[in-house]
Amino acid sequence: MPISCFKCASKCPARALEKIGKNMTVDEILNEVISDKIFYDTSGGGVTLSGGEVCMFPEWTGNLAAQLKANGINVLIETCGFFDYSKVSEYILPYVDTIFYDIKLFDSQKHKEYCGVYNDSVLSNFVTLHNNMKDFGFSLLPRVPLIPNITDTDDNLSSIAAFLSEENVSKVQLLPYNPTWYNKAEKIGTKPAIMLQELRSFPAKEQIEHAKSFFTDKNINVGGSI
């Protein structure tokens, strides 16, 4: 069973393992963020809460978001959509300005295969957020990562586009695949779980334009690093 508590790092005789990062309280994070508030005020920026999955810790995340908002700092969260909506609604949504919401795979079985869980709650949570975003006052942006032969297939993109169109979503962000992780995996002696040759290259412009067409055909505006 994999060890994820970092106890092995302190015992590693060759010091090959090192824990990166540190535990911080909400107050410690807030103090550090506030020290840079002048930059947020000047640029119109704010704080992005990402992960991991911040919605797995709704009370802690909500506490931080509430204090950020109380200090006039814009709050954005990134989520995979797999969370308990009732808790997120209670603790987080009142203090969020923007939500980036990843929709990777529309087919539930494939979502289970690649992401480890079925996507029923991912899709239903998106619909509920979209229906309630005006009441809470946040904006919601769905995002689709374009992973070669996994998420960028015609079937997947057309299904996601149809789903978003049915919910009257007006904008989506496409995230073109970045292959730089592949070489990093090899350098640390890890064999990538998926050995597709397509995963070694950046997508061609034609591939990205093809992906965009599924959404523009549904009158959905496409943004992102494209």
State where each predicted segment sits.
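Cysteine-centered iron-sulfur cluster-binding motifs in ferredoxin-type domains/subunits
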Residues: M1-R15, E53
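A structural motif corresponding to the C-terminal lobe/cap of the Radical SAM core domain
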Residues: A162, S170, A185-F214
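Conserved AdoMet/S-adenosylmethionine-binding subsite of the radical SAM
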Residues: D27-E186
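Radical SAM enzyme core and accessory elements
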Residues: D217-I226
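Active-site anion-handling motifs in enzyme catalytic cores
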Residues: M24
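Iron-sulfur (Fe-S) cluster-binding segments and ferredoxin-like electron-carrier domains
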Residues: R15-G21
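Conserved dinucleotide-binding and phosphotransfer motif residues
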Residues: R15, Q67-N71, K218
